[in-house]
């Protein structure tokens, strides 16, 4: 914990230099008084700036997190672009890389792009399914309209169109009556022969 505190204290000293005005103007955590103010007297308070560096990486070196570190320092410890300073093990970090907007962290090839593709695909599937359903309902409506035209006027309701259910019920009833008529017509012929 003491090493972490020393790391943040040295980072704060490094921010006072003139080479990081973009960082201070965009984050403005050093001049702000509040719960995130760095205070050596109170170790229980947070030692990180308001937008925490931990939100970008759990490693103090941005190269380990896959972020560019372009300060041109000597490379050591397997992390390219970062140099370890002295025996204290502190890592030198280029703070200009923090001046970009956090939206750049959501790279184009990340999971968000795949999720967006899935969303677009499901939208396309829904549209196609909706078009198929519309076509099916249109075909069904045309068939019911044709069926209504074949029903005798006895089954219609004085100028009001029949509902789908009424059309089907009356059609079944009408087919039953026609079947009875045909069966009655065949019986006398069978008896006479």
Swiss-Prot record:
Low complexity biased stretches: 40-59
Organism source for this protein?
Answer: Homo sapiens
Summarizing the function annotation, the protein's role is: Involved in specifying the paraxial, but not dorsal, mesoderm. May regulate the expression of T-box transcription factors required for mesoderm formation and differentiation.
Domain bHLH, residue spans: 124-178
Q: Which Gene3D superfamilies match?
A: Helix-loop-helix DNA-binding domain
High-level lineage: Eukaryota, Metazoa, Chordata, Craniata, Vertebrata
What's the protein name? Answer: Mesogenin-1
* Locations listed in the record: Nucleus
> Alphabetically, which GO biological process terms does the record hold?
cell differentiation; mesoderm formation; regulation of transcription by RNA polymerase II; segment specification; somitogenesis
Entry keyword set: Developmental protein, Differentiation, DNA-binding, Nucleus, Transcription, Transcription regulation
Which InterPro entries does this chain map to? bHLH_dom (IPR011598), HLH_DNA-bd_sf (IPR036638), Mesogenin/MesP (IPR040259)
Grouped into one coarse class, the protein's main location is: nucleus
Q: Name one Pfam family in it.
A: HLH
Annotated GO CC locations? chromatin; nucleus
